[in-house]
Each structure stands twice: as structure tokens, then as C-alpha cells.
Amino acid sequence: MDALLIQGGNPLAGEVRISGAKNAALPILTASLLTAEPLRLGNVPHLKDISTMLALLGHMGVRVTLDDKNHVTLSGDSIPHKEAPYEMVKTMRAAILVLGPTLARFGEARVSLPGGCAIGSRPVDLHIKGLQAMGADISIEHGYIHARCKRLQGARIVMDMVTVTGTENLMMAAALAEGTTVLENAAREPEVVDLARCLIAMGAKIEGAGTDVITVHGVEALHGAEYSVMADRIETGTFLVAAAMTGGRVRATHTSPDTLEAVISKLREAGAKVSVGDDWIEVESTGKLDSVDVRTAPHPAFPTDMQAQFMAMNTIAVGAASVTETIFENRFMHVQELRRLGANIEVSGHTALVRGVARLDGATVMATDLRASACLVLAGLVAAGETTIERIYHLDRGYERIEEKLTQLGGRIKRVH
């Protein structure tokens, strides 16, 4: 099993090109199920979750052509298997996203209940309730969601809680429904907006994406399109925190500053110098940072997927700060690993109190989920001596060639098999 070896102490410097966003690419890939015509996508990152999704779509009958490095063409003119089997769903919760488009276009779908990171329960009942409100007949048997309908009907759907994948699933389903669907308490995340833009390019009629009320006027059919996936705001944020922690100067390019306002604000509060252009963000730091309180909440507030990275930053900052997680349960699994490096962290319920220490010491640690593994990489970059991170397959689910990109910036990091 692969591991990362990191020699800490080098400031990072230079430019890093940000990859396409995994959490935007996954729903956009499933949008290929909504049309018989080819969908050509650019800026698709090379990640485990992406290849898993492409394998699932291929299993269902979508013809997948990898045109070049980051382009993929999906042709869904024939979908003989309207099913997402457990073997393909268990490693990736985003597979639930095939439910809405498959049901809307074909009137039937069978999807295994999802797996993925072990953080929180992430209930799929909001997806199911929404589709039922649109007229679907849904049952759960033997671990599978069975859904049937004639043609989905537009409906007013009020989400009990903000759900990104739920909003995306229902938005795709509503695109082919008869009549108008209104999604209230919809997720406002940039990835939801990116999916809406792709669907609009395919002929969908959608208003309000990026607000908490999305209106979808159903159409008879969608057509093919060319679309480029948005930049990964979480990868961007991770490199910016790495620059701040190591006392370096890093410019992240091919990214979208307007999707990261909460993160940029917190970096400035910590004492880092942040400059912003149209498609780049630069962080310059002495490495001497102030602790910052962080509270996760749905967009546009501070993103849960940056919580672990800011906890790592707080471990070596001056003072004490609280990190509060309001989105997912079980999202402090990195705390015990950071403690192995010498961090001073106490957890009480959904809040961790982090007291900065003078230095971290390298040790062997274990990645427990995607963002936890990123925070351990950041800690390893500043820890004295060598840090070994095991189980980095989690990292490969969400970061494209992270060790190569960090090496180009001056980090001493290598993958061992």
C-alpha cells in the first residue's frame, strides 16, 4: 500500500496549476445520462473517484472516450443497464447522482445505497423524498433504491436540510420533468452552479443556481454540449494553506478566487498576505501565523472540506483557536494523528480547541479520509524530521498528483510503494 515520505522544513515557492474540481466533475459526468447526444467535457481531473464514476457510467452503457489528458466525451445514446451496483457504489457516495438523471430519462433506475468516506451519515432520504414529490414510485429492498415513474412532474420541494448532492440530483431530474420544479433551501455551492451551467449548455432551463431557491422549467429533451469543469476550490485552498504554514510564497493559477472568499478572509486574519487576480491567488507568509477560529457551514460560509487544513495551520500558530464542525459527524478523525506529531488539541463534541505549539515532530501517521490526509501532508511539510503518511489512497480520491505539485514548489515529498 502506498505511503508518502515527507521531510519537513522547506518553504514552498512558485506557481501551481489547479486541477478541475472533483465535486463539480462528478455530477457533470452523470449529466451525460440525460441526453442521447455526446457530452464533451474539459478540465476533468485524473482522480480515483473520477475513474470510478467513468467505470460506473461505462457499465450502464455510456460510451466513454478519453480524448486527451483532461478531456472526456460521453455518449449515452443507449443505456441498457439502468443500475448502479453495490460493487461500484461502495467506494464512492457520489454514485447516487445517477439516480435522478436515469429515472428522469428512462422512467426507471436501481441504485445501491452509497458508501464513500466514513464521515457522517449523509442520508439519501432527501433525494428520495424529492423524487417522490415529483411522482416517482420508490422502494428500498436488499440495499438498493428501486425507482420508477411515467414522466416526472414538476413540484415545489422544500429541503429539510441543505444537501449538495440532493440539490444536484433533483436539479438534473427536474430538467426533463413535465412542468416547473422549485427547489427551496437548495445548496448554494459553486459546484451546484457549475452543474447548472453545464445543464443550461445542454438546453435546460434553470434559474437561481447559487441562491437557495432554484427554479427548473422542464424540457422534452436535452442535447449534447461542450463544457469545461470549474477549478477545484479545495485543492486551491490546500495549497494556499501550505504556503502560509511553510513561510513561502505560492501562486495558484487557473482557479476562481470568488469561490474562496471565506478561506481567503481567514488566511488574512491569520497574518498571511493574500493577493488576488482574475484567475489566480497568491499567498506570501513568514510562517509566523496567528490562530484563527473556524466554524464550518454551507456555502458561502467556511467550507467543511477546508476544516482539517486550517486545524493543521492552527497547530503551529500563536495562541489558541476553536474549530467547529457543523456539517458532518466524525470529521475530527485527523485529531489523534496530529497529536502523534505533537499537536495540542482537545475535542468536545463538534468543537476542537487547538493550542499552537512551537514545533511539530515528524512521525508515522495514518490517513483516515480525504481531507484528513491533506491536513497530515500540511503538518508533515512543517514538522521537524521525517513524516510518513500511510493509507494515502484517500488522498488520491481528491488530489491530482499532489506530491508532484508540492515537489515542484520545493517540498521534499515522495511516494513509496
UniProtKB/Swiss-Prot annotation:
Active site annotation, chain numbering: C117 (proton donor)
Entry-linked SUPFAM superfamilies: EPT/RTPC-like
Catalytic reaction(s) noted: phosphoenolpyruvate + UDP-N-acetyl-alpha-D-glucosamine = UDP-N-acetyl-3-O-(1-carboxyvinyl)-alpha-D-glucosamine + phosphate
Localization annotation: Cytoplasm
GO BP: any one term: cell wall organization
Residues engaged in binding UDP-N-acetyl-alpha-D-glucosamine: R93, R122, P123, V124, D125, L126, D305, I327
InterPro entries: Enolpyruvate_Tfrase_dom, Enolpyruvate_Tfrase_sf, MurA_subfamily, RNA3'P_cycl/enolpyr_Trfase_a/b, UDP_GlcNAc_COvinyl_MurA
Family: Belongs to the EPSP synthase family. MurA subfamily.
General function of this protein: Cell wall formation. Adds enolpyruvyl to UDP-N-acetylglucosamine.
Record protein name field: UDP-N-acetylglucosamine 1-carboxyvinyltransferase
Species of provenance: Thiobacillus denitrificans (strain ATCC 25259 / T1)
Lineage: Bacteria, Pseudomonadati, Pseudomonadota, Betaproteobacteria, Nitrosomonadales
Gene: murA
